């Protein structure tokens, strides 16, 4: 039940608006400034559209479009004018918003980043995409882990970006750290439609967690993004889904309190608990070991597939990018919760 898209808001509900933003073309700093202003205008539209809305979500690539341009002149900085404008929009409209930016990285390729700013102008969540959509995307692999923040009306929220959601471990990490709502922003195009839907539903069901997901929408003359906003309840049931109409705002009320209840009282299919307590009917507390070889190997830095040497695509040359010469070096980052008047 979505409360008629949030029109009938319950005391424990969180009303979300998923913006199927028209795919932009951003080539210059002037284009970036214009798109920033457009997004801020849509924040105001969302507030006017539904006074009870708590959180608005913009898709991946909302500022930069799908060109994969790494030109530093159009990259964002956390202390730059784009984030400052977004913060003012949140304060002026008294609403929480999830934004997408391509973030300047002085040590390598830009990061594909997402931020959540609250209605008081505080930065609540700052995430860098862990799994760029290789070999198509040139972004630096994220180095901030998967943060979870306190959200509106007592909720717990995590953010992942696009291709991240194809890895079940990403959703499991969000839930393990307490997320009741997992936002997934994306720029996907039509060939991914089926995978998008089944992964959003599986991520919800497997973790007793609401998933709220949205793509860019429309055409930029080269690419066609699919829209396909969707909110899935914690049992895997589709609550609302969008069309292919650019700038449509899909709304839904979700209930974090019912997520918490299910995690406490469910027996059958309480998978997030049972994963670490195997066979608790037979043995007290269940088996608490880690029988998964790939997990042990990854921690040891020895993750190698049986067919590893036969994998054909291991860099971005097929998509026009040069062979990388740097190894992965995570950079120390200071994230500071700030408020803007």
Indicate where each model-derived feature is located.
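Short, glycine-anchored, charge-dense loop/turn motifs used at functional sites
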Residues: 16, 112, 116-124, 230-244
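N-terminal active-site segment of His-dependent metallophosphoesterases
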Residues: 1-54, 183
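CN hydrolase (nitrilase-like) catalytic-core segments centered on the catalytic cysteine
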Residues: 81-98, 156, 166-253
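Active-site catalytic loop in hydrolytic enzyme cores
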Residues: 88, 105-180, 185-202, 225, ...
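Short beta->alpha transition motifs characteristic of CBS
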Residues: 64, 71, 115, 126-133, ...
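Active-site-proximal beta-strand/loop segments in catalytic clefts of secreted hydrolases
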Residues: 19-21, 60-61, 100-102, 161-163, ...
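C-terminal beta-strand edge segments of enzyme domains
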Residues: 3, 148, 210, 216-341
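Cys-nucleophile CN-hydrolase/nitrilase-fold catalytic domain and related Cys-dependent amidase chemistry
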Residues: 30-119, 124-126, 189-207
């Amino acid at each position: 039940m979505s409360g008629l898209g949030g029109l009938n808001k319950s005391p424990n509900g969180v009303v979300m608006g998923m913006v199927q933003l028209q795919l932009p073309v951003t080539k210059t700093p002037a284009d970036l400034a214009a798109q920033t202003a457009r997004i801020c205008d849509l924040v105001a539209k969302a507030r006017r559209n539904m006074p009870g809305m708590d959180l608005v979500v913009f898709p991946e690539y909302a500022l930069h479009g799908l060109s994969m341009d790494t030109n530093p002149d159009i990259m964002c900085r956390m202390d730059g004018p784009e984030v400052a404008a977004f913060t003012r929009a949140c304060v002026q409209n008294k609403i929480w918003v999830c934004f997408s930016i391509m973030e300047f990285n002085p040590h390598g390729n830009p990061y594909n980043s997402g931020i959540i700013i609250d209605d008081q102008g505080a930065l609540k969540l700052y995430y860098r995409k862990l799994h760029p959509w290789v070999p198509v995307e040139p972004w630096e692999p994220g180095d901030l882990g998967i943060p979870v923040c306190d959200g509106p009306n007592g909720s717990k929220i995590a953010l992942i970006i696009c291709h991240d959601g194809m890895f079940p471990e990403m959703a499991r990490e969000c839930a393990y750290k307490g997320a009741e709502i997992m936002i997934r922003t994306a720029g996907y195009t039509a060939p991914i439609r089926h995978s998008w839907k089944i992964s959003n539903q599986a991520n919800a069901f497997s973790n007793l967690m609401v998933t709220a997901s949205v793509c860019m929408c429309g055409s930029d003359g080269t690419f066609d993004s699919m829209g396909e906003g969707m909110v899935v309840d914690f049992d895997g049931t589709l609550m609302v889904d969008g069309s292919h109409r650019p700038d449509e705002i899909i709304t839904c009320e979700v209930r974090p309190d019912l997520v918490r209840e299910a995690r406490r009282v469910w027996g059958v299919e309480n998978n997030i608990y049972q994963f670490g307590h195997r066979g608790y009917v037979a043995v007290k507390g269940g088996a608490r070991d880690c029988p998964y070889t790939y997990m042990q190997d990854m921690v040891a830095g020895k993750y190698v597939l049986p067919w590893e040497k036969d994998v054909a695509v291991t860099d971005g040359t097929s998509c026009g990018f040069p062979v990388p010469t740097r190894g992965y070096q995570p950079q120390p980052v200071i994230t500071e919760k700030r408020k803007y008047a």
